[in-house]
Amino acid sequence: MRNISAQAITDAVARLCIEANTRLPQDVQAALDKARQEEPWPLAKNTLDLLWSNLSAAREKDLPICQDTGMACVFVELGTDVHIDGSFEAAIHEGVRRGYTDGYLRMSIVADPLRRGNTGDNTPAAITVHLVDGDGCTITVAPKGFGSENMSRIQMLKPADGVEGFRKFVLETVQLAGSNPCPPSVLGIGVGGSFDKVAYLAKKALLRPLDVPNPDPYYAGLERELLTAINELGIGPQGFGGQTTCLGLAIEQMPTHVAGLPVAVNVSCHVTRRASATL
């Protein structure tokens, strides 16, 4: 059994909140850079160049890439041989509180969805814990802005809808979103499971690097097909047209009921943020 202090968790989460909001993951940066090099439409290319300049300025000045510094979605892979010395969830919330305060990040969380009222410290975080073998603890902070989150959709398709219904739903989601999610977008797509699980799969898919395909060749092929089809829609960066509507997408799948075909699309913008640390 290995002990990890609650303070170590707080320190890691605070650091990751700032890092994720000021520096994009290398795979997202590479996809954005590739897109601006290859985009043929002048207005779209100029827009991508501006996004790249903004990204560079944020990195150089340690400033947020986007004014919407997001809801702190925290994913933890916790070894079953780990003992936390203190309150685990309280340590995460305190890390978010400290990171958003020390990093001068926008406080975007309301205490109640209907009665509202800003909590003033961007807590509580949305915490997901996955138990794994061993004595490790890996924490990923993925701040999620709601311009793109609000464009996300879930649908309980019929089994008869099949792969064509699946494709149609994904493309329809991108078309309905238009310029609202600040494209070029990144898509996390879930298929299978239940109503709640498919939404989780879509969110989980956003954690996979854009240069890592689904290990199942069938779904890896679907990822390539969908990316091509989405970029042929012509929405383009910020809705100005062009061939760069989506930087990348990932599909996560799981078994489902014989009577169902759940599908969820979690839409993210070009500022798809995540930062990880292993304790």
Which residues does each predicted region cover?
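Non-transmembrane, aqueous-exposed alpha-helical and coiled segments at domain scale
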Residues: M1-I189, S194-L279
